[in-house]
Amino acid sequence: MSIEIRNITKSFGSFQALKGIDLTIGSGELVALLGPSGCGKTTLLRIIAGLEAADSGQILLHGEDTTHRHVRERRVGFVFQHYALFRHMSVFENIAFGLRVRPRGQRPPEAEIRRRVQELLELVQLDWLADRHPGQLSGGQRQRIALARALAVEPKVLLLDEPFGALDAKVRKDLRRWLRRLHDGLHITSVFVTHDQEEALEVADRVVVLNAGQIEQVGSADEVYDHPATPFVCQFIGDVNLFHGRVHGGRALIGETVIELPDIAESDTEKALFFARPHEIEIGRGTGIGAVVRAIRRRGNAVRVELERKDGRGAVEAELSREAFGRHAIKHGDEVVIQPSKIRMFQP
């Protein structure tokens, strides 16, 4: 089922949570709403579900206007960050709940409910926990049960609000990969909210980056990471270094340093913002931006080097492989020069 969001606005008092959101999500697509706290991503998800009313605009599900339809009429499954499982019910009863509370004319026979619940328990690989209660489960197991409960009513759209936010890092990583595999098998249109860039880039078909109630960019993981549309996207997704400078003759001028811009067809400008990721910063002793090594931090197979520019214009972070770090023989307090091997340019 496709989702079409047309010029959705929403305010809470004087605060504008959403400012004219337009977005189309294809049938069977898995889309991440990514952004910082307060950007409007959860509000948008709740409006799609029918849990929140928009001030203006339309929500179309499979071409039908559902803007004013009750949540029960939208055939939407919702998974909350904190599971929202019924503690007094067993796992089996939690999953069956949505089917058993349907009006009598829409309620499946009990045998069909039991068959459906058993299928879902096997789907989420927790059939051996059917008689347990939520308090006896781990966080990861609870979230799988919450997902099974959402799927029990056979929704046309699955919405997930920070589904892994309450879990530790290792469980989060395992569960998001499991969710991707599950989605590939079910092909149900899914939208999930997250503030975790790595999570969005790894799981989603497309990422919608929101900021201050507006969409900054929509694209694949590669598009938003390698080709950010705005300075906000560039700074929000992944680590990045910011340099202030200007453009002249197809070159970036950062202080006294000149960097060729072969991929940027920009006219001369007196003010420009240049961004380079830590792994795009080269460290040497020739020409470049003078800097002093202030800290060295080893992170698995990589080494992060924190540097302070000698011209007083801020700090720079570089990332080297352990092999490259060993060749440079860098130590704390060394005076070096840095040179971005690749930069992205924006006009302020």
UniProtKB/Swiss-Prot annotation:
User: What UniProt keywords are attached to this protein's entry?
Assistant: ATP-binding, Cell inner membrane, Cell membrane, Membrane, Nucleotide-binding, Sulfate transport, Translocase, Transport
Q: Where in the cell is it found?
A: Cell inner membrane
Record's Pfam families? ABC_tran (PF00005), CysA_C_terminal (PF17850), TOBE_3 (PF12857)
Enzyme nomenclature, EC number = 7.3.2.3
The cross-references to SUPFAM superfamilies, in alphabetical order and at most eight, read: MOP-like, P-loop containing nucleoside triphosphate hydrolases
Q: Which domain of life is it from?
A: Bacteria
A GO molecular function held by the record = ABC-type sulfate transporter activity
Cross-referenced InterPro entries: AAA+_ATPase, ABC_SmlMolc_Importer, ABC_transporter-like_ATP-bd, ABC_transporter-like_CS, CysA_C, Mo/tungstate-bd_C_term_dom, P-loop_NTPase, Sulph_transpt1
Domain ABC transporter, first and last residues per copy: 3-237
Per its record, how is this protein called by name?
Answer: Sulfate/thiosulfate import ATP-binding protein CysA
Top-level EC class as recorded in UniProt = translocase
What does this gene product do?
A: Part of the ABC transporter complex CysAWTP involved in sulfate/thiosulfate import. Responsible for energy coupling to the transport system.
User: Which is a Gene Ontology cellular component entry for this protein?
Assistant: ATP-binding cassette (ABC) transporter complex
- Matching PANTHER family: SPERMIDINE/PUTRESCINE IMPORT ATP-BINDING PROTEIN POTA, SPERMIDINE_PUTRESCINE IMPORT ATP-BINDING PROTEIN POTA
| Coiled coil region boundaries | none
